[in-house]
């Protein structure tokens, strides 16, 4: 397709006056499973569910961004919920089996990754586990292609993981 664009510029007589930029995002990583941090939050009393598995209340909730997850507190000023959530997520990260390679506080995420939002924490994947929003069932699940976050490859990871971006620029003003 790049050749088609360049040919079209030549045919139109504008090739010598055109600047070309070829850029890419940082790509996708292959995954082998999905993990559900909300299942652990529920197990540890930070998400309350009824007998039918419906959420009745919550103090912390993970919102998936595929290979990362943003963790929100219902009341960001609730120090007890903050400490309990941070301790649980940190223990899961240290265990090395829950698909979490890093737990960022909101301040660390902003300072180190320039990521800012209403979240209290950000989870980064181990590179082969995608995060789910589910709070029911088992923590670890096999791949499920019914949701784009849980296919054989996905996005949402730190830019220094996986394939690196491409930037090629050429033309008369470059």
Task: Cite the ranges covered by each PLM segment.
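Charged catalytic carboxylate motif
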Residues: 1
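Secreted, luminal/periplasmic, and some membrane-associated catalytic domains
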Residues: 4-150
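Low-complexity, glycine/alanine/valine/leucine- and proline-rich hydrophobic stretches
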Residues: 135-174
């Amino acid at each position: 397709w790049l050749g088609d664009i360049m040919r079209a510029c030549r045919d139109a007589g504008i090739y010598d006056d055109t600047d070309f930029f070829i850029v890419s995002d940082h790509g996708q990583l292959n995954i082998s499973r999905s993990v559900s941090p909300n299942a652990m939050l529920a197990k540890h009393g930070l998400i309350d569910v009824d007998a039918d598995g419906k959420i009745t209340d919550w103090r912390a909730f993970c919102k998936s961004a595929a290979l990362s997850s943003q963790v929100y507190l219902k009341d960001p000023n609730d120090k007890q919920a903050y400490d309990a959530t941070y301790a649980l997520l940190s223990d899961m990260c240290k265990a090395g089996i829950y698909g979490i390679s890093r737990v960022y506080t909101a301040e660390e995420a902003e300072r180190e990754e320039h990521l800012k939002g209403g979240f209290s924490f950000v989870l980064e994947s181990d590179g082969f586990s995608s995060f789910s929003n589910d709070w029911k069932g088992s923590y670890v699940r096999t791949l499920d292609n019914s949701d784009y976050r849980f296919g054989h490859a996905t996005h949402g990871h730190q830019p220094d993981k996986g394939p690196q971006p491409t930037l090629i620029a050429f033309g008369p003003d470059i």
